Amino acid sequence: LLTTCTALAATVGTGNITGVAAALAIGGPGAVFWMWAAAFLGMALAYTEVYLGILYGGGPYVYLENGVGSCFAGKCYALFCVLESLGMGCMVQAGALADSLRYAASLPPLGTGIILAVLTAVVLFGGAKRIGWTASVLVPVSAGLYLLAGGSAVFSLYVPIPEVLGNIVGGAFGLADNAGQTDGSSILNFSGISGGMTGYGMAAAIRSGVSRGVFSNEAGLGSLAVLHGMSEGKGRLRQRQEAQKQGRWAIVEVVFDAIIGC
């Protein structure tokens, strides 16, 4: 449970809000469909990376070196992981929080950064146990509030769910603007300028949906393997059983983040 909450703490968050908003702005409603599609592929990637991480006793940098036999690839991954954590893992979240507090509470971004640095240091210096405990406390509360706020917005605004789903599917495959209709009037138009705009819209939906989906659930990046690597089983058989169990939990995390949360 601690490792699952820690992994959800890394996936559920800013990517579900700013990531989805950016995907919709770039690719339209069809981007949501491709975020879901990327999540289904990401389930297999999440299971595989977590399984290998526990089997080899570490993250991708370990099984790249010991499993694949490439020490260079493992070191390259470790370097890229550090660089990725600075942007995707820290700057986006800290920047979003700083902007929110600046407008809501007139707190300068520097003050937000100092507070975040102190709180993060307190948690990190406590080791893996404190990280897991903090995640197990914060994740259920934050995820519950997020889903409650999103659900209340949908129901209070009387959003027509069937029409929204029709627009999502229609936008994903480059249908006309009336993709939410079901009378057969939504057809593909590949003639002249309209066809070019349709193809461009579909490409933008796929590109933004897949990229923002990976940004949100982190499936395939290897970070899930690092977090789940804290779970170990004694003996080769127990280790394989633990790897399979944690791999299934990784699938649940992707479903919760990308399918439910987004």
Annotate each predicted stretch with a short phrase.
Residues L124-P140, P160-L165, D183, G201, ...:
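Hydrophobic, small-residue-rich membrane helices and short re-entrant helix-turn-helix hairpins
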Residues A23-Y61, A73-G74, D257-C262:
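Extracellular loop-to-transmembrane helix junctions
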